[in-house]
Amino acid sequence: MIELPEALNIAGQINDTIYGKRVASVIAVHTPHKLAWYYGEPPKYSDLLIGRTIGKANAYGSMVEIKAENANILFGEGAGIRFHGKSEPLPLKHQLLIEFEDHSAMSVSIQMYGGIGSFLDGELDNPYYKVAKEKPSPLSPDFDKVYFNYIISAQEVQKLSLKALLATEQRIPGIGNGVLQDILFNAKMHPKKKVNTLSNKDKEDLFSSVKTTLSAMATQGGRDTELDLFGHPGGYKTILCRNTVNKPCPICGTIIKKEAYMGGSVYYCEKCQQL
């Protein structure tokens, strides 16, 4: 799943590869997918985009948005975005395929679930999109200790677990159940630990881990569990994920555990991250 580090990396790669290209053709909903949702109206994507010039791509939380003059192209969650050079074969299955006048292309294929869209400026009335654009990125200067303290001190979050605090309700756009695992590992906190049990030092450590962990992931091109615009895994070696379950903790050697929790999985070292 795309989360903030991957969104930042893919946006940068898009700017390096398709910025300035003119759209020649658009195919939407070529391959049906039950868990693909579309922003805007897919039958109108062609009329909306053909002839327009690709502008800058930006990451907003876990979303990647590409400008195309006064139109926008949006991807999120499990959208597998790939660039295809002039001589490269195009995928047979996809939910969106955009070809450019120079015969290069970009395709989007939904993995588990995800969103794709195209719409004119100001047209999309989607709360997740709006919040992702309005709230400060956790890697921006505006996301400081004062702002984080505002989030973690709210009365309504005191009985929540740290997983629920960080990865639900769009409190911090871009943090999902993936990057959450290493953030909590580096902070030495269990994902089920309650917010109201945190000391002031715990809160400082958690804030620091949010910043440093996400920064490491972003600067290394995303996590090694996710693929970039060219189908390559990110350079950040994920500590806690499906690939490290039942392997020794890199700090203490305790076997990493996996549990079902809150509709997904959590990974932790029971010695380093005591509840």
Located regions from the model:
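Acidic, proline/glycine-enriched N-terminal capping motif
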Residues: M1-K130, L275
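Short, mixed-charge, low-aromatic patches
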Residues: M1-P5, S104-S109, G122, E134-P141, ...
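Generic signal for short, ordered secondary-structure residues
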Residues: I2, G78, P127, K145, ...
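Alpha-helical structural motif
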Residues: E3-E6, I10, Y19, D144, ...
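Basic, nucleic-acid-binding surfaces and adjacent catalytic neighborhoods in DNA/RNA-processing proteins
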Residues: A24-K44, T53-N58, I151-L275
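Short clusters of hydrophobic/aromatic residues that line enzyme substrate/ligand-binding pockets
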Residues: L49, V131-E134, L139, M189, ...
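Short histidine-centered catalytic/ligand-binding loop motif
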Residues: S87, K130-P141, K193-N200
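A short, charged helix-loop
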Residues: I116-V157
